[in-house]
Amino acid sequence: VHLTGEEKAAVTALWGKVNVDEVGGEALGRLLVVYPWTQRFFDSFGDLSSPDAVMNNPKVKAHGKKVLGAFSDGLAHLDNLKGTFAQLSELHCDKLHVDPENFRLLGNVLVCVLAHHFGKEFTPQVQAAYQKVVAGVANALAHKYH
């Protein structure tokens, strides 16, 4: 991902304020509610029968935290996202058979959640930088599919 120095600074500054537990669970939960077909990858998570059930599901929250932990690793290696996400790409492609479009959807949901949490601080410029990052992460995760 090519970010200007200003964009990198904006991404890093905001990410330092992110509560990974809270934002991760909310982002994954929203993905499962807004795009219900993504739930098929989470059969073992128990009750996903309603938006409330999804958003309060401890397994959704725990996996969301794990997902954002990996995203944090990516932010530390923006110049090598493909390498950073190679193993996760392989896992999601070969073993889990996740549609790579879901990575793009989750990235966009994450941007929405960040906008919700940070309000005016999440300026159009910050959003533009984050859109570049989530697109880069989605492409890296989809790399094994190509």
Swiss-Prot record:
<dbReference type="InterPro" id="IPR050056">
    <property type="entry name" value="Hemoglobin_oxygen_transport"/>
</dbReference>
<dbReference type="GO" id="GO:0031721">
    <property type="term" value="F:hemoglobin alpha binding"/>
</dbReference>
<feature type="modified residue" description="Phosphothreonine">
    <location>
        <position position="12"/>
    </location>
</feature>
<dbReference type="GO" id="GO:0031838">
    <property type="term" value="C:haptoglobin-hemoglobin complex"/>
</dbReference>
<keyword id="KW-0349">Heme</keyword>
<dbReference type="GO" id="GO:0005833">
    <property type="term" value="C:hemoglobin complex"/>
</dbReference>
<dbReference type="GO" id="GO:0031720">
    <property type="term" value="F:haptoglobin binding"/>
</dbReference>
<dbReference type="InterPro" id="IPR000971">
    <property type="entry name" value="Globin"/>
</dbReference>
<keyword id="KW-0479">Metal-binding</keyword>
<feature type="modified residue" description="N-acetylvaline">
    <location>
        <position position="1"/>
    </location>
</feature>
<dbReference type="GO" id="GO:0019825">
    <property type="term" value="F:oxygen binding"/>
</dbReference>
<feature type="binding site" description="proximal binding residue">
    <location>
        <position position="92"/>
    </location>
    <ligand>
        <name>heme b</name>
    </ligand>
</feature>
<feature type="modified residue" description="S-nitrosocysteine">
    <location>
        <position position="93"/>
    </location>
</feature>
<keyword id="KW-0408">Iron</keyword>
<feature type="modified residue" description="N6-acetyllysine">
    <location>
        <position position="82"/>
    </location>
</feature>
<keyword id="KW-0813">Transport</keyword>
<dbReference type="Pfam" id="PF00042">
    <property type="entry name" value="Globin"/>
</dbReference>
<feature type="modified residue" description="N6-acetyllysine">
    <location>
        <position position="59"/>
    </location>
</feature>
<comment type="subunit">
    <text>Heterotetramer of two alpha chains and two beta chains.</text>
</comment>
<keyword id="KW-0702">S-nitrosylation</keyword>
<dbReference type="GO" id="GO:0042744">
    <property type="term" value="P:hydrogen peroxide catabolic process"/>
</dbReference>
<dbReference type="InterPro" id="IPR012292">
    <property type="entry name" value="Globin/Proto"/>
</dbReference>
<feature type="modified residue" description="Phosphoserine">
    <location>
        <position position="44"/>
    </location>
</feature>
<feature type="modified residue" description="N6-acetyllysine">
    <location>
        <position position="144"/>
    </location>
</feature>
<dbReference type="GO" id="GO:0043177">
    <property type="term" value="F:organic acid binding"/>
</dbReference>
<dbReference type="GO" id="GO:0020037">
    <property type="term" value="F:heme binding"/>
</dbReference>
<keyword id="KW-0597">Phosphoprotein</keyword>
<keyword id="KW-0007">Acetylation</keyword>
<dbReference type="GO" id="GO:0004601">
    <property type="term" value="F:peroxidase activity"/>
</dbReference>
<keyword id="KW-0561">Oxygen transport</keyword>
<dbReference type="InterPro" id="IPR009050">
    <property type="entry name" value="Globin-like_sf"/>
</dbReference>
<comment type="function">
    <text>Involved in oxygen transport from the lung to the various peripheral tissues.</text>
</comment>
<feature type="domain" description="Globin">
    <location>
        <begin position="2"/>
        <end position="146"/>
    </location>
</feature>
<dbReference type="GO" id="GO:0005344">
    <property type="term" value="F:oxygen carrier activity"/>
</dbReference>
<dbReference type="GO" id="GO:0072562">
    <property type="term" value="C:blood microparticle"/>
</dbReference>
<protein>
    <recommendedName>
        <fullName>Hemoglobin subunit beta</fullName>
    </recommendedName>
</protein>
<feature type="binding site" description="distal binding residue">
    <location>
        <position position="63"/>
    </location>
    <ligand>
        <name>heme b</name>
    </ligand>
</feature>
<dbReference type="InterPro" id="IPR002337">
    <property type="entry name" value="Hemoglobin_b"/>
</dbReference>
<comment type="similarity">
    <text>Belongs to the globin family.</text>
</comment>
<dbReference type="GO" id="GO:0046872">
    <property type="term" value="F:metal ion binding"/>
</dbReference>
